[in-house]
Design a protein with these regions (language model features):
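A short, acidic, amphipathic alpha-helical segment used as a generic capping/interface helix at domain edges
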Residues: 218-232
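A short, acidic, flexible beta-alpha connecting loop/helix-capping segment that sits on the rim
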Residues: 13, 240-262
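Active-site acidic/histidine proton-transfer and metal-coordination neighborhood
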Residues: 53, 73-163, 260
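Hydrophobic faces of well-ordered beta-strands that scaffold small-molecule active sites
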Residues: 4-10, 33-35, 58-63, 102-104, ...
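Acidic/histidine-rich catalytic cores of soluble enzymes
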Residues: 33, 125-220
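Acidic-and-aromatic substrate-binding clefts and catalytic sites of carbohydrate-active enzymes
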Residues: 11-17, 34-46, 109-114, 143-148, ...
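N-terminal pre-domain/capping segments
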Residues: 1-89, 95, 132, 150, ...
Length: 282
């Protein structure tokens, strides 16, 4: 897109291999892609090769989150160590394939009291220190438990290697539509742009089934307001969209996407991406 690069996240639900997705993203008009790494180093290598072949930007590698909660819990020291080492390995992959950013969650868990600990800050500090040594930026993403995100960013966002990944959908369905760009937009380095229907439960109980990853403009997001918020941060780097063509369990909001041929769905993703980007840049 003129004066704005657009990126789409690969997705195991798209029905073709991630390297093939890179080719299809290019054909649809996107400039870049990212990959969720869950221990499959060969997947990252194959996507990097596809990116080189099709002249696509490898925007980021998304780290796993299975040890994120343990990294805050002194009673789970062995798993906390595993979490730190897992993040370090993901950083190594970024170095190996010239990927500038690792996206990382800082917590995962529902139905509990969110209390950041010094133990957690110390563990994430080890990851941050390693990223700094390796020349990789970490984009910490908003998920459930913004208390943990705030704790990590307040401790480390003064460092050049630390920034914020804003997930517009998580903000609506996990963070009660708090304006997190107002809080951390000064270090915005990555985006996961998507839509949803907010929190389904009347009493405000959050759950991952609400994290629909609809195309922008298909949910309740106020996209004029969101565009103005992004614009206010001054962020001019590649915009990443994280979208899903499959519905969550016992939900049907994404079914219409799954009924489309993948090429048609990706074309619609690109249309929505351009529409939102133009609202930021006008």
């Amino acid at each position: 897109m003129y004066k704005r690069k657009l990126c789409l996240s690969t997705n195991s639900t798209f029905g073709v291999s991630e390297p093939e997705q890179v080719r299809l993203f290019k054909e649809a008009g996107f400039d870049g892609f990212n990959v969720l790494w869950w221990g499959d180093d060969a997947l990252v290598e194959n996507c990097a090769r596809a990116g080189e072949e099709h002249k696509m930007i490898f925007q980021s590698i998304h780290a796993p989150w299975n040890y994120c909660a343990d990294m805050w819990d002194e009673n789970e020291k062995e798993d906390a160590i595993k979490g730190v080492e897992q993040f370090k390995h993901c950083i190594d992959l970024c170095v190996k394939y010239n990927v500038p950013v690792m996206v990382a969650h800082v917590y995962v868990g529902f139905d509990e009291e969110y209390k950041p600990t010094a133990f957690g800050i110390e563990n994430y500090g080890k990851v941050v220190e390693y990223a700094s040594e390796k020349g990789v930026k970490i984009a910490f993403e908003n998920t459930e438990g913004t208390e943990y995100l705030d704790a990590v960013l307040n401790a480390y966002k003064h460092l050049e290697c630390v920034g914020f990944c804003w997930d517009s959908g998580h903000e609506m369905c996990y963070n009660y539509s708090e304006n997190l760009l107002e809080r951390h937009g000064d270090v915005l380095i990555a985006t996961h742009i998507n839509d949803n229907l907010g929190i389904r439960d009347y009493n405000g109980k959050i759950f991952w089934h609400d994290d629909l990853h609809l195309l922008p403009f298909d949910g309740i997001g106020d996209w004029d307001e969101l565009a103005q918020r992004v614009k206010k941060t001054g962020f001019s780097d590649i915009l990443t969209f994280e979208l899903n063509n499959k519905s969550k369990p016992n939900r049907h909001e994404n079914d219409k996407y799954d009924e489309m041929p993948l090429e048609k769905y990706l074309a619609e993703c690109y249309i929505r991406a351009c529409r939102f980007a133009s609202m930021i840049d006008r």
